C-alpha cells in the first residue's frame, strides 16, 4: 500500500536522479512533491504533466529513465508555499538536496522569516520544515540530508528546533547520508545533441546525467514501527567511518585527479583513463595513503570496506567510474571550488593529516595539493585570490610563496602537522612540473 508521502527540497540531479527516482520506483508513495525555486524548471516539469527524464551513465552506455507523477512547487510563490506546508504536514519522508548546509536557514530579509501583514510567512527550508512538523498529521517523519557534510542532519535539526521547539524523537528523525553517486547537469545544447541525451522536460535545454551506482548509506532509522518507503538505502548505526571513507577516499582522489587534469590542460576526466602514469598516482594515493590510514583507523569495525581487499575493490570501482566516458565529467566541474577543497581539514589536506597520524607519507596527496595551487593561480580572479598572492606561473613559485598561499588557504588555521604538510607540497612542485611536461607529450 502506498502509504508514504515524499517531499524534496531542491531539484538537482541527486534529488531527481536518486531520492525522487527511488521514491517513484518503490511504489510506496501516494504523493511525491519537489520544492524548487527555479521557475523555468518548475514550469517545464509541470507542463510535462509532472514527468521528467534522467540519463543514467552505465559502464557500457546510457539508459533513459522517465519519472512520473511529481508535483513541482515553488516556495517563493505564496499559493504554492501554502500547498507545500500542507504536504510537509503529511510527509513521512523529506529530503534536502541543497548546495550546502548554509542554505538551510536562508530565504528571507529577516533571518528565517518575512512578514506579510500580521502573519509571519516562513521562507527558509528550516522554517518550512518546522512549520510542517508543527501541523504534522504523519505517524512519523524522517528527514534525509544530502549536503555532503558529515553533520548535516545535526545542523538542520538544530535550525528546525530553534523554530519548532523540542522535537519528538519518537516521531521525527534527521538522517545523515553518504552519497557516492556522481552526477551533473548538462546545459550545453551541442553536448546534449552529440551524446543523445534526453532533456529534463520538453522545452528545457538542460539534462540530468547521473551514474548508475546506487549504494547509498544512511543513518539507521530508530523510530518504532516505522519502515522507510525508500527501501534501497543501506542503514548504518554509525556513519562517521563511511563519511570519512568518502571524504578522504572518494572526494580526495576525485579532487586530486581533477586538479592534475586541470594542470595538464585536460577538459574531460575520461581523458585520464589512458594515461597510466596519472591513474597510477591516483591509485597509489587511494590505496597506499588514504586507504592504508583508514584501514588502520577503522579495522576494529570488522566491516569489509576497511580491509585491504574491500578497500581495493572500492578504489578500483571508483577510479573506473571517475573516468567513465558515458558520464563524461568535465575537469572544470571536478576542479572547481578549489579554495574550499584545499582547506586545512578538507579532502586533500585532511587526508594528508590522517596519513601522517598513522605514520604514512602522503607524497601523492601532496602532488594533488600542489596541482590544486596551480589551478588556484590559473583561475586567480575566479577564486578571489588576493592581489598580493597572484604570483602568476605556478612553475616559478619558490617555497616562501607556496607557504604564503597555503596559509591563506587555511585561513591562518594550523595543526600539529602544519610544517610537514607545507614541506610535502613544496617538495611536490618539481614532480608536478615533470608530470605536466609529460602530459603535453601524451
Model feature map: region roles:
Residues 2-435, 442:
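Substrate/ligand-engaging "lid" and interaction regions
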Amino acid at each position: 500500500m502506498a502509504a508514504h508521502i515524499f517531499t524534496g527540497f531542491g531539484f538537482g540531479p541527486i534529488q531527481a536522479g536518486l531520492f525522487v527516482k527511488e521514491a517513484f520506483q518503490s511504489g510506496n508513495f501516494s504523493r511525491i512533491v519537489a520544492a524548487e525555486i527555479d521557475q523555468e524548471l518548475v514550469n517545464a516539469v509541470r507542463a510535462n504533466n509532472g514527468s521528467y527524464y534522467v540519463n543514467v551513465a552505465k559502464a557500457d552506455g546510457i539508459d533513459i529513465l522517465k519519472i512520473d507523477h511529481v508535483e513541482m512547487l515553488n516556495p517563493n510563490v505564496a499559493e504554492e508555499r501554502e500547498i507545500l506546508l500542507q504536504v510537509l504536514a503529511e510527509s513521512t519522508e523529506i529530503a534536502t538536496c541543497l548546495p550546502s548546509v548554509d542554505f538551510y536557514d536562508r530565504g528571507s530579509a529577516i533571518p528565517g522569516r518575512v512578514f506579510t501583514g500580521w502573519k509571519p510567512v516562513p521562507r527558509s527550508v528550516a522554517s518550512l520544515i518546522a512549520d510542517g512538523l508543527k501541523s504534522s498529521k504523519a505517524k512519523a517523519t524522517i528527514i534525509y540530508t544530502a549536503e555532503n557534510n558529515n553533520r548535516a542532519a545535526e545542523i538542520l535539526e538544530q535550525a528546525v528546533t530553534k523554530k519548532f521547539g523540542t522535537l519528538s524523537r519518537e516521531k521525527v528523525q534527521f538522517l545523515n547520508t553518504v552519497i557516492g553517486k556522481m552526477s551533473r547537469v548538462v546545459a550545453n545544447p551541442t553536448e546534449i545533441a552529440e551524446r543523445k541525451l534526453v532533456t529534463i522536460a520538453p522545452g528545457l535545454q538542460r539534462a540530468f546525467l547521473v551514474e548508475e551506482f546506487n549504494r547509498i548509506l544512511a543513518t539507521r532509522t530508530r523510530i518504532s514501527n516505522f519502515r522507510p518507503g525508500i527501501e534501497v538505502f543501506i542503514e548504518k548505526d554509525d556513519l562517521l567511518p563511511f563519511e570519512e571513507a568518502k571524504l578522504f577516499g572518494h572526494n580526495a582522489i576525485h579532487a586530486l585527479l581533477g586538479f592534475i587534469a586541470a594542470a595538464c590542460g585536460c577538459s574531460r576526466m575520461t581523458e585520464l583513463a589512458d594515461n597510466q602514469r596519472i591513474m597510477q598516482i591516483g591509485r597509489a594515493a587511494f590505496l597506499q595513503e588514504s586507504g592504508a590510514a583508514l584501514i588502520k583507523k577503522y579495522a576494529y569495525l570488522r566491516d569489509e570496506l576497511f580491509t585491504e581487499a574491500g578497500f581495493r575493490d572500492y578504489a578500483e570501482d571508483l577510479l573506473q567510474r571517475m573516468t567513465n566516458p558515458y558520464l563524461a565529467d568535465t575537469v572544470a566541474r571536478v576542479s572547481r571550488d578549489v579554495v574550499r577543497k584545499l582547506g586545512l581539514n578538507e579532502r586533500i589536506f585532511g587526508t594528508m593529516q590522517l596519513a601522517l597520524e598513522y605514520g604514512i607519507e602522503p607524497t601523492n596527496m601532496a602532488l594533488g595539493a600542489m596541482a590544486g595551487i596551480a589551478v588556484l593561480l590559473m583561475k586567480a580572479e575566479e577564486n578571489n585570490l588576493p592581489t598580493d598572492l597572484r604570483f602568476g606561473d605556478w612553475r616559478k613559485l619558490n617555497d616562501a610563496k607556496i607557504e604564503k598561499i597555503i596559509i591563506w588557504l587555511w585561513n591562518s588555521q594550523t595543526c600539529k602537522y602544519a610544517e610537514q604538510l607545507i614541506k610535502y607540497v613544496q617538495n611536490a612542485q618539481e614532480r608536478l612540473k615533470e608530470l605536466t611536461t609529460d602530459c603535453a607529450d601524451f
